[in-house]
Amino acid sequence: METIAVRHGLSPTGLAVRFVAGFLPLAGLVFTTPHVCAKTWHVAPEAIQSIATTEQFETIGEGVARARPGDEVTIHGGIYREKVIVDQNGLPDKPIRIRAAEGEYVVITGADHITDWSETQRDAHVYVTGWPHEFVGWNDHNTHPADDYHRLIGRCEQVFVNGYTLGQVLERDRLIRGTFYVDLETERLYVWPADNQDIASKKALVEASVRDRVLHVKGDHIEIKGIRFRYASNRAQQGAAEFTGDHITVTDCTFEYTNASGAEFSGQNIVVRNCVFQHNGQLGFGASRAHGLRLTGCTVRNNNIKGFNRGWEAGGNKICLTRGAVLEQSTFVENRGDGIWFDIGNEDCEVHNCLIAFNENAGIFYEISYGLHAHDNVIVGNGFAHTPSAWGASSGISLSSSPFCVIERNLIVGNKEGFNLREQRRTTPRIDGPSEPVWNHDQIIRHNVMAYNRDTQVWGWFDVADERHWPASMQDKPPAAPASNDSAAHPTHLSLEGLKLTFANNLYWPGPGQGLFNWGVTWKKHRRFKSLEAVRDELSLGEGGEVAEFHMVDYSALDLRVPPDSPAVRMGCYPTGDIPGVRLGSAR
């Protein structure tokens, strides 16, 4: 009785009321609310004999559709070629759980297994099949973005032979081994395997991406665990898995080999725990208005494998218009762009106890946003790609027109540049309001180690005509700028004293031939300071800082233990807490 009531949307309380109303002569009896037991639904490619047929399904979508608050959908091992939509809600104390069965390998893929091939060129083993799919239909080149740079990169099609990715060409006569071509006019897909094998014999597994999303969680209070997501044909700036509901928990999942972004988070209070974002075409993940996002114990590595423009949107992640995001105890490594990128109107975000290493652009790039707290991180080996537009953003940490930040107890070692302030004339939308001017001010950079960074340990890249980054006494008054519609909104008469930039108690150690403290962009007035005394005398920055030898046990092995008498320890510049993949502490 109670199970039927719940399945038909009738609450246990409603059932009791109807029962009492129908039997008023029995008013002396006491009626209690029926107990509704949570159910477990099973999903498996083939029937499991030990489970009732009424409790198992062939597709995840069928199982999810039956789930109610407190239920669990257990997915057994298999490759599931479907798009799963979760649009019902759990409850705070009764979330809906969707998880891989213990010890089983579960994949949700955007690719179908293609078997209907015809050979078109016997000596070269070029094959053709039907292709009714079009993913970007709003411009002539079927790409996003629609510029020439992304003419090929911005396409969405993907083909895999035995798990190996084929390259794409834009003309049929350019086919070579290991490539494919999509003819949208004739709706044909042409494939030439890298090993020239006969794929029509069905001895090879040929998969092609046909779904632009593999998962969309719209509901609140949903838990996802232990699933691998891959091979979606999503366009740039679109997640292969999308999480738009609130209070979602994603644990032990992998997002990989998608055409663009592995996942997109836009609900509030989402927790992402022990997940891997790897080998995605554009980004590991994106987030927008994902207030309270917490990413903990995750690995974000080798993303932007298609080569999207690093200065547009590419690399480990991009987070926009989000308040209170926390990235902790995670690794952001070897991404082809920034390791961590916050851009546009973010507020009060935190990055702590992370390894941020060997990313092609900045380790952390905090752009036109507010109030970053970055502390107790190891940030090494970032910024060495040739990205001409990345001036002021080829460093361990770059604050780009982003005020009210606190940067403390980070090891910023061995990057192209150590710490950057990047300034242009910028505005940003606010989370709860219209756009406004934004610039670097009220910054606290304290108790960090900045050592062995190739070009310099600190560089203030201020590309502004008003010379705000110089003390008033050092400014060369520029001619008045022409009036513009937004002139009144932007700050005027600024000087370094008014910016309230604090560099305090940092430890600096340039290696041989490396810079210490640069100020100003190279194409305008700038200085290269060779001593902290000169920095203090001219800029009044660097209070309590020291230039002193900094040594580690083995930088290449990320054994960053230091001697007990290290100045990093004495000055309080050494990270506290554990950081994944790094050995920290005192070495005797």
Model regions and ranges:
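N-terminal secretory signal peptides that target proteins for export/translocation
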Residues: M1-A16
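Bacterial N-terminal signal peptides
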Residues: R18-T32
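Sec/Tat signal peptide C-region and signal peptidase I cleavage site
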Residues: P34-C37
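Extracellular polysaccharide-degrading/modifying enzymes targeting complex plant/algal/animal polysaccharides
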Residues: T40-G245, F503, Q514-G515, K524-E549, ...
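Glycine- and acidic/polar-rich repeat regions and solenoidal domains
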Residues: R211-L215, R230-G245, A260-I270, Q278-G545, ...
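Mature catalytic domains of secreted/periplasmic carbohydrate-active enzymes
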Residues: I248-T249
